[in-house]
């Protein structure tokens, strides 16, 4: 079975984890709410007006 020849340093470990974190941050895209015009996450109710697909689902 394959095993690492050298121990992974803290710096290398943290660099690997940081790449995954920043890739996740960049993956968020925002769309304009058709009801109020504010930016909101897609496929979710708008946190500013509470509408989703022309229906009010949250009381704001």
From Swiss-Prot:
Gene Ontology BP, a term: translation
Keyword Oxidoreductase: no
Highest taxon, organism lineage: Bacteria
Keywords: Ribonucleoprotein, Ribosomal protein
GO molecular function: structural constituent of ribosome
One Pfam entry name: Ribosomal_L32p
A GO CC annotation given for this chain: large ribosomal subunit
PANTHER family: 50S RIBOSOMAL PROTEIN L32, LARGE RIBOSOMAL SUBUNIT PROTEIN BL32
Similarity section: Belongs to the bacterial ribosomal protein bL32 family.
Protein name as catalogued: Large ribosomal subunit protein bL32
The species this protein was found in: Hydrogenobaculum sp. (strain Y04AAS1)
């Amino acid at each position: 079975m394959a095993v690492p020849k050298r121990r992974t340093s803290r710096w290398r470990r943290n660099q690997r984890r940081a790449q995954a974190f920043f890739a996740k941050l960049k993956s968020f895209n925002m769309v304009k709410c058709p009801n109020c015009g504010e930016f909101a996450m897609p496929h979710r109710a708008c946190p500013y007006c509470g509408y989703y697909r022309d229906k009010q689902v949250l009381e704001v």
